[in-house]
UniProtKB/Swiss-Prot annotation:
The gene is CYP1A1. One of its GO terms (biological process) is fatty acid metabolic process. This is Cytochrome P450 1A1. Glycans are attached at S71. Its cofactor is heme.
Length: 524
């Protein structure tokens, strides 16, 4: 019996020694592999995570809310792990401006995510990790082409620019469609029609073409945009835990399907443009890019050429950014209008006073409609429908606010936290457009500049300016003619659904009443 106890004691001692040895070895390996923090700097703080999973469960279904809560505890620069991947999370307007603007070259990278490789075969200008001179030159080219066929003067039109012409046409269609639906059904889901009209605006700029609202090929693409947002939103687990890519995943399957359909749709349109291209007769953005491609020149400082594939990739980026963001902005705007009827009345009173009913609103009216602008800003701020920027990564070893961040580190930028910071806004949960107006009724430009939605710095949204103009003009034209409500007894659900863009539940009980006769001319 004593020999048995002795054996047990021996085994226990052996196991204990083995455990100590393994622990010490593991500790040594971790210390050896861990990036050495330069003297005077610190590693960003953060909570302890679970083995293998890291902080996946902490993020939950609403990562923007979870990380905002953590920022209150750990500060504007904190670190989490998703799987085994460390992620630095930035909050606070000053901190984010420091990173993306003042230290923009340090933070302009993109992480090499699996989901990003599925977008335009991994060659997307927006999602690709590349951020060198070739990328910068292509981005400038895309910006110039977008500007040329949006806010540049259209000599063949009475409108001030191409964008104004296209939006007026689509807004007029929506008004007549809503009126018809009211006469036939008595209520409708505005998103069903908004998404196609907004898509038609970017189609006109890219391809010089307008699609029917019942075009099945177009509908199959735009109706899958929610799946795109689910996968590309910050914190998508399969990007950080590779084994999850091989498990059944309906969102990932839909994402792959969407990208194939989207690329095929763009490829067909671009090929048709190549077939009908005439040098000197540039019809749209695609023609403009083809011309650059055939000239074999991109930028005098970048020794690269624009291949045929790159033309498609740039168009995919412009097209993708051009319909989802604007559609989401207008959709949220309508939700706020029906839940804040007093705000809607004030906007319409301003439109009647400044413009009247004898003509449509135009882009040149924007500076004279401060309350409408304040409403749009408050919609951007309160909804924060782009809660994070597309994830960034560091391009070199750097420091921020005294914290060391090594090269290649994934960085989340929490825009939602800025827009709901109580110190900045006082009552961030209240929807109050008046906060953006001065005592004299003009737009408060300083406060307006603190609303953060489209990113900052070298990776900011390429279509921000055009998107803002488009949202303004759509809303101005619609609200001049129509009053939006919901069917009596029905309520709208404004609970955000997380993704790259925050969505709300669809509402099929919208109503649109043609406004009673008002002043035909601006009031004195």
């Amino acid at each position: 019996m004593s020999s048995i106890y002795g054996l047990l004691n021996f085994m226990s001692a052996t196991e204990l020694l083995l455990a100590i040895t393994v622990f010490c070895l593991g500790f040594w390996v971790v210390r050896a592999l861990r990036t050495q923090v330069p003297k005077g700097l610190k590693t960003p703080p953060g909570p302890w995570g679970l083995p293998i999973l890291g902080h996946v469960l902490t993020l939950g279904k609403n990562p923007h809310l979870s990380l905002t809560k953590l920022s209150k505890q750990y500060g504007d620069v904190l670190q989490i792990r998703i799987g085994s991947t460390p992620v630095v999370v930035l909050s606070g307007l000053d901190t984010i401006r420091q990173a993306l603007v003042r230290q923009g070259d340090d933070f302009k990278g993109r992480p090499d995510f699996y989901s990003f490789t599925l977008i335009t075969n991994g060659k997307s200008m927006t999602f690709n990790p590349d951020c060198g001179p070739v990328w910068a030159a292509r981005r400038r080219l895309a910006q110039d082409a977008l500007k040329s066929f949006s806010i540049a003067l259209d000599p063949a039109s009475a409108s001030s620019c191409y964008l104004e012409e296209y939006v007026i046409k689509e807004a007029d269609y929506l008004i007549s469609k809503f009126q018809k639906l009211m006469a036939e059904v008595g209520h409708f889901d505005p998103d069903r029609y908004l998404v196609v009209s907004v898509t038609n605006v970017i189609c006109a700029m890219c391809f010089g073409q307008r699609y029917d609202h019942d075009d099945q090929e177009l509908l199959s693409i735009v109706n899958l945009s929610n799946e795109f947002g689910k996968v590309t939103g910050s914190g998508y687990p399969p990007d950080f835990i590779p084994i999850l890519r091989y498990l059944p995943n309906s969102s990932l399957d839909a994402f792959k399907d969407l990208n194939k359909k989207f690329y095929s749709f763009m490829q067909k349109s671009v090929k048709e443009h190549y077939r009908t291209f005439e040098k000197g007769h540039i019809r749209d953005i695609t023609d403009s890019l083809i011309e650059h491609c055939q000239d074999k020149s991109l930028d005098e400082n970048a020794n690269v050429q624009l291949s045929d594939d790159r033309v498609i990739n740039i168009i995919v980026d412009l097209f993708g950014a051009g319909f989802d963001t604007v559609t989401t902005a207008i959709s949220w705007s309508l939700m706020y209008l029906v839940t804040n009827p007093g705000v809607q009345r004030k906007i319409q009173e301003e439109l009647d006073t400044v413009i009247g009913r004898s003509r449509r609103p135009r882009l040149c009216d924007r500076s004279q409609l401060p309350y409408l602008e304040a409403f749009i800003l408050e919609t951007f701020r309160h909804s924060s429908f782009l809660p994070f920027t597309i994830p960034h990564s560091t391009t070199r070893d750097t420091s921020l606010c005294g914290f060391y961040i090594p090269k290649g580190h994934c960085v989340f930028v929490n825009q939602w936290q800025i827009n709901h910071n109580q110190e900045l806004w006082g009552d961030p949960n209240k929807f109050r457009p008046e906060r953006f107006l001065t005592s004299s009724g003009t737009l408060d430009k300083v406060l307006s500049g603190k609303v953060t939605l489209f990113g900052l710095g070298k990776r900011k949204c390429i279509g921000e300016t055009i998107g803002r103009l488009e949202v303004f003009l759509f809303l101005a034209i619609l609200l001049q003619q129509i009053e939006f409500t919901v069917s009596p007894g029905e309520k709208v659900d404004m609970t955000p659904i997380y993704g790259l863009t925050l969505k709300h539940a669809r509402c099929e009980y919208f109503q649109a009443q043609t406004r009673s006769s008002g002043p035909q001319h601006p009031q004195a």
